[in-house]
Amino acid sequence: PYLKESHGSVINFASGAGLFGNYGQCAYAAAKEGIRGLSRVAATEWGPDDINVNVVCPLAWTAKLEQFQQAYPEAFKANVKMPPMGHYGNAELEIGRVCVQLAMPDFKFMSGETLTREGGMGQRP
């Protein structure tokens, strides 16, 4: 009820794993694509109530990624690709700010969309 009253915004998170077909990530990619599908349907169903729903697919440096790098440096080097921009995104600055923008009234007409914030990673072969 509050979402209808507030004409709010919903921002869900998915992953490039589903968009780009990352090797060895079948279950993870399927789950994240489910989020994208759910979000598109919600955007259609909730649009008449002036609720917009979008998805962000981030690639950010996280504590878990850092733990993996420290625990398994060779596996990290072999398996974790660096985006073309040469660094992973900063969760607060490069991911968080786009989420704030998506929740602003200026972006109200944007709904059912997927935004990637992955430093060009999707351009890699």
Where in this protein do the model-derived segments appear?
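Active-site loop immediately N-terminal to the catalytic Tyr-X3-Lys motif
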Residues: 7, 20-26, 48, 86, ...
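Catalytic Tyr-x(3-8)-Lys segment
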Residues: 74-93
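Residue(s) in the substrate-gating loop at a strand-loop-helix junction
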Residues: 15
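A short helix-coil junction within the Rossmann-fold of NAD(P)-dependent oxidoreductases
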Residues: 1-9
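Short C-terminal tail/terminal secondary-structure segment
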Residues: 20, 99, 111-125
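Conserved SDR Rossmann-fold cofactor-binding beta-strand/turn motif
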Residues: 52-60, 103, 116-118
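Active-site helix of classical SDR
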Residues: 31, 39
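Short, small/polar-rich loop/turn modules that mediate ligand/substrate recognition or access, typified
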Residues: 47, 52, 110-112
